[in-house]
Amino acid sequence: MKALLDLFKQVSQDEQFDAIKIGIASPEKIRSWSYGEVRKPETINYRTFKPERDGLFCSKIFGPIKDYECLCGKYKRLKHRGVICEKCGVEVTVAKVRRERMGHIELASPVAHIWFLKSLPSRLGMVLDMTLRDIERVLYFEAWCVIEPGMTPLKRGQIMSDDDFLAKTEEYGDDFRALMGAEAVRELLRTIDIDREVETLRGELKATSSEAKIKKISKRLKVLEGFQKSGIKAEWMVMEVLPVLPPDLRPLVPLDGGRFATSDLNDLYRRVINRNNRLKRLLELKAPEIILRNEKRMLQEAVDSLLDNGRRGKAMTGANKRQLKSLADMIKGKSGRFRQNLLGKRVDYSGRSVIVVGPQLKLHQCGLPKLMALELFKPFIFNRLEMMGLATTIKAAKKLVESQEPVVWDILEEVIREHPVMLNRAPTLHRLGIQAFEPVLIEGKAIQLHPLVCAAFNADFDGDQMAVHVPLSLEAQLEARTLMLASNNVLFPANGEPSIVPSQDIVLGLYYTTRERINGKGEGIFFTDVAEVQRAYDNGEVELQSRITVRLTEYERDDNGEFQPVLRRHETTVGRALLSEILPKGLPFTVLNKALKKKEISRLINQSFRRCGLRDTVIFADKLMQSGFRLATRGGISIAMGDMLIPKAKEGILAEASREVKEIDKQYSSGLVTSQERYNNVVDIWGKASDKVGKAMMEQLATEPVVNRHGEEVRQESFNSIYMMADSGARGSAAQIRQLAGMRGLMAKPDGSIIETPITANFREGLNVLQYFISTHGARKGLADTALKTANSGYLTRRLVDVTQDLVITEDDCGTTQGYAMKALVEGGEVIEPLRDRILGRVAAIDVVDPDTQETAIAAGTLLDEDLVDLIDRIGVDEVKVRTPLTCETRHGLCAHCYGRDLGRGSHVNVGEAVGVIAAQSIGEPGTQLTMRTFHIGGAASRSALASAVETKSTGKVGFASTMRYVTNAKGERVAISRSGELAIFDDNGRERERHKIPYGATVLVGDGEAVKAGTRLATWDPLTRPIVSEYGGAVRFENIEEGVTVAKQLDEITGLSTLVVITPKTRSGKTVTRPQIKLVNENGEDVKIAGTDHSVNISFPVGALITVRDGQQVAVGEVLARIPQESQKTRDITGGLPRVAELFEARSPKDAGMLADVTGTVSFGKDTKGKQRLVITDLEGVSHEFLIPKEKQVLVHDGQVVNKGEMIVDGPADPHDILRLQGIEKLATYIVDEVQDVYRLQGVKINDKHIEVIVRQMLRRVNIVDAGDTEFIPGEQVERSELLNENDRVTAEGKRPATYDNVLLGITKASLSTDSFISAASFQETTRVLTEAAIMGKRDDLRGLKENVIVGRLIPAGTGLAYHMARKDKEALEAAEREAARQLANPFEDAPVTVDADAPQSDAGQEGSAE
């Protein structure tokens, strides 16, 4: 009977668990796992191939080799199950146990575990409070360590060399005890009193105030508390018993030719056993100490390399000089256990093939080759054959299928019907990279794919391959059908735009059809309906592009929401009228009544989705595609040399540019400009010329002359093929056409600097050798970049996914009223992103109030859809406070309200949606489109910086922002002297229309409150130099301006003119050289003071400034004292593209970051120290704060200026950590979102803000404890925000003091590694370190994230899995409650206290359920 039960036990090994705990195994634990001791290094007998007894593959320890058969063959078959053979000692059972039974090795001398020794910071060192160097000396038998000092003056843990030891032994005899090796360390660990240590440390922590000490103590405290809480004993870090891995996990495989392939682990184990046995023998023989010492050291080294080869000393190598793979190597890295086998497995029931286009398919179908389908659906076919009685056994069914009988094909058709398959194209960069389709059987061997899903897969038909997977279980089929079917995924999750937008041929066909031609055949005819138009077109009476008038039926919804037909007359073209047939009900004809370019078609599909729903849109898109292909073919648009029209004006433009360049060269040789300015100007001239040629070419291409009905010549949009391809957005761009028919223009060298001689030819004219050579630079750099980019972009995506993988929508509403105020994004006076785009799909945090009537237009908590955003636009609200993931108060996960709309579905987000992963994919997916390079200012990048004036785009009133300060100079011009001055233009209602930054030193041409018309110049400035402007009048007095010390006379060799240039001061010994500066003196010879203070005006010059005034010269307010040439203002590299995004998400402080004021107060300068200047801010209480700033930095403030907290005081890029510290989370989020968006916008990639916000939320998930209050935390410790809030709630409920904390910004790599889940962190990076730390702390992983659950093989807690886990937990809680109730019913007369007691755990469980 027992055997029967055992049989059942073996089958159902389906344990449910909710958490995984990791710890350090005690020797007893290791022995309890073991089925016997491995005593011999032998593996298998080379003649019989049977395992040696007591060896590494011993059957007695690890189990039989064949199922139910002992080694000597005495017992065979099932009936002897469980018998232990008396001859060979092998238990008769399944051979599978060789994968799970472990053995052990009793070590003759204890051995320290290398992970706890060498993984930095060394855990052994922390517990013992010794340095790693000292512990190593003891462990590897180079020094003695005092264990018990007894009555001697020695200290416990003191290290002594051999000579010292002998001397001390002579002195004290055996009053003290000292040991060497792992025994010493184990003794020290065993005798340490952890509770007392923790108490002393806590006391020291309260008493000390030095930063370094606090850091050191709290680190050690953390480790010791880990031991204390987890109940792990410190001495277990030193091993007495070594577990042996089950043999089938380190197999020995016979190869043909009598050789064996073996796992490296066997070698490593062999070494350990050999050394251990030798040591045992030496101990029995009472060998001399020195031999034993050597043997013990070798044993320690052997165990080290088994656990982590190469971690210490030289790595052990096999016969072929290759490093052996140790246990640690098995789990870490890309090919380790985590990433190779647990997170990415190869899948059964899958196939791959080349894809070809299948334009006849519906959107939800794909063509599957018959042979592939036959192979993939085999089990289903077998089942069907048996059910129909065509085959009696599986074997027979197999035969039928293999001979491909006709009946098999019919059955295949049946089996495949309504059974979706999943198609995947690698690289799968976002969730649209895997979609489900209904298979349609086809001949041939290639998979057919619908053209419209190519955009989502990023596929083309130039040899791409795709993989097919079959969802087997009913649930899987259901999910594939409802969630993954291609026709259910028509929006990009990144931005909510349609993904099934036609491209290329389709666009060209639709565009050609919907263009209008002046005086086409049949122009001006009136038609009754579309059918009549069709007849006329078929008979050749009208042309496709002719303008006609036709009566069309449109459908509009009445009050009941029913469609009512409405007849209207439209002036349109033949093509558009014919297209109107496929328009879904509910869309007006006006959406089609224009030339359909790619953007228009995208908008059309978007409108259709919002108004007509998913089904109609999919059908509409399919029909659009069919029409597009058909019409493109009928249009017969081709491409020819003659289409590339070279502009007539080209020669003139080039001649003019050459003349200007000669002029600049002349100025340079006469010394009016510097060489850098000459280069900048030349590049600028050619850039402008290139643009002019391009413009002339486009103008010539874009229109053509034509005679209209009245015989007049007019110009119409051209029907030139190349122009139509570019204009429709089908293929190519103006820039590419410019290279074909205009001029190629300026080329860059590989380092990014621009070659100043442009390529004046185009591809139609052909390039000469020099021009061709110049252009190869760019092409090769492009190829190299692409290869780098792909790897970098993939790594960025991996880090992003890792940091956000546990973020899931877990509840509907967290109930917060927090949120961020959203405004339209304005840059350089242009609205880059209107307010409607930024708030679409968000939830209003507070009521939106109509500014005119002051009534609530939209209540708080409403999801803002298209109609509501239009309403907000109409009533003229310019700021809306919306909920955001950053202010969500859900502890684990996010709430649906703070997230808003699920962009991939177009509706409110569901609970269980894995929004973290979606955000990571949305940001990572376009990564390959971003550039890799860092720009140098100069060349192309500086061309964008060469704006020299700003004009208003709208009519209104000028308003100066509060930051705007200016002085009026002698000519009556206003000169801006503020660093961050801004001008705004307000319309009649006082709403801000645009806003412009005015740089320092610009001439402002309008006054505050002045009315201006659109196109008015607001300000001008010199783009190539930056002036230093005087704010006061007076006579100049030079200070520290000594030639050869602080300034140099710069003689231009060519011109012979000299200027004073500020240089880095040469320090003479003993003399401190201060900065060159000037003071202003009034008529009486006194210093001019800053208004309202007694500070005198002093203006200091940065290095590289050209001083334009002379000593003693009278200057007026607003006059230029010096100019800083733009290039000497340190050409800062602008990091662009992918590296910039990575930099932002890794929260790196920029190299020469700008400085923000820590406090609000008045600026003054203290005494300069070597190479640094001292800047002092005195706050409102009179406390002064000092900052040391390197001399070469540009200080943006002057003596006596008042600055606000968080304002820039030293020029340079902002440091995100400073922004968080001084301006708070909201400012930081805005900064990161805007900066990331800038990079993507430059490439024309749209990503919704909330994806970036989700990542920022994860970067802010840890906090730094400032004051622990009455909580269990240690000051300076970093903890998970949710953990801290829970603990604070608990403490506050008990009426104690909660902990106070600072926000911490972690980079995505750091944040992933600091997650609470050790499984997730270990599978990401630094596996060894993560596991070591987790084991000491006895960490418990609650399997909250997706990654942990994938690794342990459970359903992920997202989507359908979340519901499954929640239901399971509720059920368990319910069952526990029922058991409890039943128990109480069984013995109702127990005394009261017990029942109360029994109630407690149940309520506890209830709470746990709710907390989840």
Curated annotation (Swiss-Prot):
InterPro entries registered for this protein in UniProt: DNA-dir_RpoC_beta_prime, DNA-dir_RpoC_beta_prime_bact, RNA_pol_asu, RNA_pol_N, RNA_pol_Rpb1_1, RNA_pol_Rpb1_3, RNA_pol_Rpb1_3_sf, RNA_pol_Rpb1_4
Binding site for Zn(2+) 1: 70, 72, 85, 88
EC number in record: 2.7.7.6
Residues reported in the UniProt entry to bind Mg(2+): 460, 462, 464
Keyword Transferase set for record: yes
Cofactor(s) of this protein: Mg(2+); Zn(2+)
Record-listed Zn(2+) 2 binding positions: 814, 888, 895, 898
A molecular function GO annotation: zinc ion binding
Cofactor note: Binds 1 Mg(2+) ion per subunit.
GO cellular component, one term: DNA-directed RNA polymerase complex
Segments of this protein annotated with the region Disordered: 1378-1412
Catalysis: reaction(s): RNA(n) + a ribonucleoside 5'-triphosphate = RNA(n+1) + diphosphate
NCBIfam families attached to this UniProt entry: rpoC_TIGR (TIGR02386)
Functional summary from the UniProt entry: DNA-dependent RNA polymerase catalyzes the transcription of DNA into RNA using the four ribonucleoside triphosphates as substrates.
Record-stated family: Belongs to the RNA polymerase beta' chain family.
Subunit structure: The RNAP catalytic core consists of 2 alpha, 1 beta, 1 beta' and 1 omega subunit. When a sigma factor is associated with the core the holoenzyme is formed, which can initiate transcription.
Protein name (Swiss-Prot/TrEMBL): DNA-directed RNA polymerase subunit beta'
Source species: Bordetella petrii (strain ATCC BAA-461 / DSM 12804 / CCUG 43448)
Lineage: Bacteria, Pseudomonadati, Pseudomonadota, Betaproteobacteria, Burkholderiales
